[in-house]
A protein has these predicted regions:
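Active-site neighborhood of HAD-like aspartate-dependent phosphohydrolases
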Residues: 1-41
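Asp-based, Mg2+/Mn2+-dependent phosphohydrolase catalytic module
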Residues: 1-3, 95, 108-222
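Helix-loop "lid/cap" segments that line or gate small-molecule binding pockets
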Residues: 27-28, 48-63, 115, 149
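Short helix-capping segments at alpha-helix termini
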Residues: 30-34, 60-63, 120-124, 153-154
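Metal-dependent phosphoesterase signature
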Residues: 54-92
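Short, acidic loop-to-helix structural element flanking the phosphoryl-transfer center
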Residues: 78-103, 109-113
Length: 222
């Protein structure tokens, strides 16, 4: 039985990861760092910006200028303003779901709120929004998901996590929650390889049109 549904944001509710990846690849190329979209997906997907920057510094020995983050975020939000979309059928799912739900994202509060606003989901940027800034350890640690459960007074075993990234799946597994992997984002290759050990979801689905087919009890009865 599920009492709380926890949605990731980027790559689940909104089709943002492909835009973010392309912008990061381009920004780092300006400093002589050559990575591709596959590298971003394998190493950075589902992680917070500070964690990503820490790994870049460690792996490439690169000290980015103090204004790099501000400039990257400004370019990213400009790209979001013209290209960000909500995942198909997400709005319908959020309107019909019959239990408490929230969002748990590695994005900053400002970016998450702005992104949700761009796709008409600004009403979710209040108490339903939980970000990595609220916990000591971000994904793949379970801290953020466990915080969601705690704030809702829900047993983690009765929580359902909807994730796209391996790090998010790992976090959900570590939290002792049921995890469904959404594979319909533009950033994920088709066909998608099997997940490695330690990052196995309980179920997969590639469109929110079939979300309630996976467990009809999640849908509000009319």
């Amino acid at each position: 039985m599920i009492d709380l549904v926890i949605f990731d944001c980027d790559g689940v509710l909104i089709d943002s990861e492909i835009i973010s990846a392309r912008m990061l690849v381009a920004a780092l190329a300006g400093f002589g760092v050559t990575i591709d979209l596959d590298y971003v997906a394998r190493h950075f997907l589902g992680r917070s910006y500070p964690t990503v920057m820490q790994q870049i510094r460690a792996e490439f020995g690169l000290d980015l200028p103090p204004d790099f983050e501000d400039q990257y975020r400004a370019r990213l939000m400009a790209a979001f303003a013209t290209g960000l979309t909500i995942m198909p059928h997400v709005r319908s799912v959020l309107e019909q779901i019959d239990m408490p739900f929230c969002i748990a994202t590695s994005s900053s509060p400002m970016r998450a709120a702005a992104s949700l606003g761009l796709v008409g989901l600004s009403h979710l940027a209040g108490q339903k929004l939980f970000t990595a800034t609220m916990v000591e350890r971000g994904k793949p640690a379970p801290d953020l998901f466990l915080l969601c459960a705690e704030k809702h007074g829900t047993d983690p075993a009765r929580c359902l996590v909807i994730e796209d990234s391996l790090n998010g799946i790992r976090a959900g597994n570590a939290a002792g929650m049921q995890v469904w992997r959404f594979t319909g984002g533009s950033h994920l290759p088709k066909p998608l390889a099997d997940e490695p050990e330690g990052a196995k979801p309980d179920r997969r689905f590639d469109t929110f049109e079939t979300f309630f087919c996976l467990d009809p009890r999640l849908r509000r009865r009319t």
